[in-house]
Swiss-Prot record:
UniProt-recorded name of the protein: Cytochrome c oxidase subunit 3
Record field: transmembrane: 16-34, 41-66, 73-105, 129-152, 156-183, 191-223, 233-256
Source species: Osphranter robustus
Quaternary data: Component of the cytochrome c oxidase (complex IV, CIV), a multisubunit enzyme composed of 14 subunits. The complex is composed of a catalytic core of 3 subunits MT-CO1, MT-CO2 and MT-CO3, encoded in the mitochondrial DNA, and 11 supernumerary subunits COX4I, COX5A, COX5B, COX6A, COX6B, COX6C, COX7A, COX7B, COX7C, COX8 and NDUFA4, which are encoded in the nuclear genome.
Keywords: Membrane, Mitochondrion, Mitochondrion inner membrane, Translocase, Transmembrane, Transmembrane helix
Summary of the function given for this chain in its UniProt record: Component of the cytochrome c oxidase, the last enzyme in the mitochondrial electron transport chain which drives oxidative phosphorylation. The respiratory chain contains 3 multisubunit complexes succinate dehydrogenase (complex II, CII), ubiquinol-cytochrome c oxidoreductase (cytochrome b-c1 complex, complex III, CIII) and cytochrome c oxidase (complex IV, CIV), that cooperate to transfer electrons derived from NADH and succinate to molecular oxygen, creating an electrochemical gradient over the inner membrane that drives transmembrane transport and the ATP synthase.
Amino acid sequence: MTHQTHAYHMVNPSPWPLTGALSALLLTSGLIMWFHFNSFLLVIIGLTCMLLTMYQWWRDIVREGTFQGHHTPVVQKGLRYGMVLFIVSEVFFFLGFFWAFYHSSLAPTPELGGCWPPTGIHPLNPLEVPLLNTSILLASGVSITWAHHSLMEGNRKQMIQALSITILLGIYFTILQASEYYESSFTISDGVYGSTFFVATGFHGLHVIIGTTFLIVCLLRQFNFHFTSTHHFGFEAAAWYWHFVDVVWLFLYVSIYWWGS
């Protein structure tokens, strides 16, 4: 092995970006096949490919950062910038959905009956399951902060407890959201209200599932003593992402559930 005179990580060639792109192609193509031909085969293949890619890519990053020491302070600084820019891009992603919602609701067209919610739509009560979901995500924001402080103080037991609570709250939120979708009186095909509601809240739900997976990986790493009080960017990135998911939900609740109803 040649001697390295700089602090940067020269990444080895990896197949995972290619397999990740392939799984994205299979998933999007699979959704089209599912919607038009009621065939779920491509979706299953795409999901399997994506899960395998996630596992192996995460495994490589954990190996490089924890066991090989490639994640120097300089590399961690670059990773932090990358995570911040990723969250900024996600903000603009959700901004498009809010724009579509307000564009449709502030000046309803005659086709919608000139009112919002459109004629025939019975919106969900914001003081029932949506309010419970809000309290769940706010509580999870508190518990993830508790986990972060416990990690920085070297309190392993409390960190595991707090992170486990956050994961359980995330799973509970997902179950409640799924039951709410199942019991709602309108669908994604019910005009602009249905499409904006289900796309905005559905993508948020997907982000909750991704964030919960991220936190589960962090919990498994904590069990294996991968984090220290000074070297834990993987957990820090997951916590930032989770706080972002919390804030997006507050805007969704106020805009779509409360004001929009």
